């Protein structure tokens, strides 16, 4: 069916892990002639990213997890107020359907939609269902998951399970295109490692990588690194590289503008295990060493990595396990036998769904066709 003149609301915010999958869907909806409006919170990441691409409306919203007693007491009142404001906004926008990708802003918008009989799709990017989506699952028309969730039958009712689909994480087209490209691991003397700390950086990873390169050189392993530090650690990390030859450094930057180029360049990635990073590495067929963020809610980054690890397409080290000895124990055999990297690349591509965006689009069309 055509989506022409259909008013679809995207709500997502807080982190890139929520925002970038939502952007991929929003773009596909626009290509299918839908009218797309984004709802986010002011003074947020989405407020700085989304306006370049889509019309965005704002409501104030905040979470309750790990907050003080006063905020926990006032939270229900604020949620009720924001939900009421969201109802007015949805009526003003003449919304036909709402898609929530997580973040606190999704709560009041999706609740408001359900209250006034507007269909709701929610998408969970992580291998652990977040608090907002656990609540919204009761009201959603369709529940989309990126990963198989352990013991989901204990978290969802039979009615909720019946409306649940595993669709993967939407990623950008230029990264999906890497899925069709075979990675060739030659007997090159250089092992190219991409290091990603996430948009805010990862201090522990940033500190150990320069030491890893020095130690590797001592053991005859020639590493070249492309290191994304995050904005907070750029100068400090650059200083840690000052005694390392430029022959071992492709670039050290706070951000990488074109991730498809970076993924295509690398033989191996060392990174956190945010949902989007895990999905992009898998789709790009890039073997990975995942270092889950220790403070991640419900340890979700550890669980995000497990599908790839269990399929022999990557490794996972807890941050306290991220020693030079453990990293070298992984890297040295891969450097000596590049066919292991090639096999890991093939397995990585099989672990995730690459047509996630199209599957979510299909959900949208089915719901609106039956509306």
Swiss-Prot record:
<dbReference type="InterPro" id="IPR006009">
    <property type="entry name" value="GlcNAc_MurG"/>
</dbReference>
<keyword id="KW-1003">Cell membrane</keyword>
<feature type="binding site">
    <location>
        <begin position="15"/>
        <end position="17"/>
    </location>
    <ligand>
        <name>UDP-N-acetyl-alpha-D-glucosamine</name>
    </ligand>
</feature>
<comment type="pathway">
    <text>Cell wall biogenesis; peptidoglycan biosynthesis.</text>
</comment>
<dbReference type="GO" id="GO:0008360">
    <property type="term" value="P:regulation of cell shape"/>
</dbReference>
<keyword id="KW-0573">Peptidoglycan synthesis</keyword>
<keyword id="KW-0132">Cell division</keyword>
<dbReference type="GO" id="GO:0005886">
    <property type="term" value="C:plasma membrane"/>
</dbReference>
<dbReference type="GO" id="GO:0009252">
    <property type="term" value="P:peptidoglycan biosynthetic process"/>
</dbReference>
<dbReference type="GO" id="GO:0030259">
    <property type="term" value="P:lipid glycosylation"/>
</dbReference>
<keyword id="KW-0328">Glycosyltransferase</keyword>
<feature type="binding site">
    <location>
        <position position="199"/>
    </location>
    <ligand>
        <name>UDP-N-acetyl-alpha-D-glucosamine</name>
    </ligand>
</feature>
<feature type="binding site">
    <location>
        <position position="256"/>
    </location>
    <ligand>
        <name>UDP-N-acetyl-alpha-D-glucosamine</name>
    </ligand>
</feature>
<keyword id="KW-0997">Cell inner membrane</keyword>
<keyword id="KW-0808">Transferase</keyword>
<dbReference type="InterPro" id="IPR004276">
    <property type="entry name" value="GlycoTrans_28_N"/>
</dbReference>
<feature type="binding site">
    <location>
        <begin position="275"/>
        <end position="280"/>
    </location>
    <ligand>
        <name>UDP-N-acetyl-alpha-D-glucosamine</name>
    </ligand>
</feature>
<keyword id="KW-0472">Membrane</keyword>
<keyword id="KW-0133">Cell shape</keyword>
<dbReference type="GO" id="GO:0071555">
    <property type="term" value="P:cell wall organization"/>
</dbReference>
<feature type="binding site">
    <location>
        <position position="301"/>
    </location>
    <ligand>
        <name>UDP-N-acetyl-alpha-D-glucosamine</name>
    </ligand>
</feature>
<dbReference type="Pfam" id="PF04101">
    <property type="entry name" value="Glyco_tran_28_C"/>
</dbReference>
<feature type="binding site">
    <location>
        <position position="126"/>
    </location>
    <ligand>
        <name>UDP-N-acetyl-alpha-D-glucosamine</name>
    </ligand>
</feature>
<keyword id="KW-0131">Cell cycle</keyword>
<dbReference type="Pfam" id="PF03033">
    <property type="entry name" value="Glyco_transf_28"/>
</dbReference>
<dbReference type="InterPro" id="IPR007235">
    <property type="entry name" value="Glyco_trans_28_C"/>
</dbReference>
<dbReference type="GO" id="GO:0005975">
    <property type="term" value="P:carbohydrate metabolic process"/>
</dbReference>
<protein>
    <recommendedName>
        <fullName>UDP-N-acetylglucosamine--N-acetylmuramyl-(pentapeptide) pyrophosphoryl-undecaprenol N-acetylglucosamine transferase</fullName>
        <ecNumber>2.4.1.227</ecNumber>
    </recommendedName>
</protein>
<dbReference type="GO" id="GO:0050511">
    <property type="term" value="F:undecaprenyldiphospho-muramoylpentapeptide beta-N-acetylglucosaminyltransferase activity"/>
</dbReference>
<dbReference type="GO" id="GO:0051991">
    <property type="term" value="F:UDP-N-acetyl-D-glucosamine:N-acetylmuramoyl-L-alanyl-D-glutamyl-meso-2,6-diaminopimelyl-D-alanyl-D-alanine-diphosphoundecaprenol 4-beta-N-acetylglucosaminlytransferase activity"/>
</dbReference>
<dbReference type="GO" id="GO:0051301">
    <property type="term" value="P:cell division"/>
</dbReference>
<keyword id="KW-0961">Cell wall biogenesis/degradation</keyword>
<comment type="similarity">
    <text>Belongs to the glycosyltransferase 28 family. MurG subfamily.</text>
</comment>
<feature type="binding site">
    <location>
        <position position="172"/>
    </location>
    <ligand>
        <name>UDP-N-acetyl-alpha-D-glucosamine</name>
    </ligand>
</feature>
<comment type="function">
    <text>Cell wall formation. Catalyzes the transfer of a GlcNAc subunit on undecaprenyl-pyrophosphoryl-MurNAc-pentapeptide (lipid intermediate I) to form undecaprenyl-pyrophosphoryl-MurNAc-(pentapeptide)GlcNAc (lipid intermediate II).</text>
</comment>
């Amino acid at each position: 069916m055509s989506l022409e003149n259909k008013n679809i609301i995207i709500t997502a915010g807080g982190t890139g892990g929520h925002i970038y999958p939502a952007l991929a869907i929003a773009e596909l909806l626009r290509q299918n002639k839908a009218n797309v409006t984004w709802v986010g919170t002011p003074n947020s990441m989405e407020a700085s990213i989304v306006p370049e691409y889509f019309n965005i409306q704002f409501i104030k919203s905040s979470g309750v997890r790990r907050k003080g007693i006063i905020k926990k007491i006032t939270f229900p009142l604020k949620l009720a107020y924001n939900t009421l404001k969201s109802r007015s906004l949805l009526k003003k926008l003449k919304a036909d359907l709402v898609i929530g990708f997580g973040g606190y802003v999704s709560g009041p918008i999706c609740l408001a939609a359900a209250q006034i009989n507007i269909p709701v799709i929610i998408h969970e990017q992580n291998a652990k269902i977040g608090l907002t989506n656990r609540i919204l699952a009761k009201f959603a028309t369709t529940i989309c998951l990126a990963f198989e969730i352990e013991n989901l039958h204990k978290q969802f009712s039979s009615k909720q399970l019946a409306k649940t689909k595993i669709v993967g994480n939407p990623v950008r087209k230029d990264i999906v295109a890497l899925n069709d490209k075979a990675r060739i691991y030659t007997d090159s003397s250089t092992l190219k490692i991409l290091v990603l700390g996430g948009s805010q950086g990862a201090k522990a990873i940033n500190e150990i990588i320069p030491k890893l390169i020095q130690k590797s050189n001592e053991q005859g392993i020639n590493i070249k690194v492309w290191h994304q530090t995050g904005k907070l650690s750029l100068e400090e990390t650059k200083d840690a590289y000052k005694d390392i030859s430029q022959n071992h450094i492709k670039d050290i930057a706070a951000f990488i503008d074109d991730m498809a180029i970076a993924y295509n360049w690398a033989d191996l990635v060392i990174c956190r295990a945010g949902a989007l990073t895990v999905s992009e590495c898998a789709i790009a067929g890039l073997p990975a060493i995942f270092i889950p963020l220790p403070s991640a809610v419900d340890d979700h980054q550890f669980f995000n990595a497990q599908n790839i690890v269990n399929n022999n397409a990557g490794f996972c080290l807890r941050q306290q396990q991220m020693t030079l000895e453990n990293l070298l124990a992984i890297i040295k055999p891969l450097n000596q036998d590049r066919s292991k990297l090639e096999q890991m690349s093939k397995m990585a591509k099989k672990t995730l769904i690459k047509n996630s965006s199209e599957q979510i689009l299909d959900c949208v069309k089915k719901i609106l066709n039956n509306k």
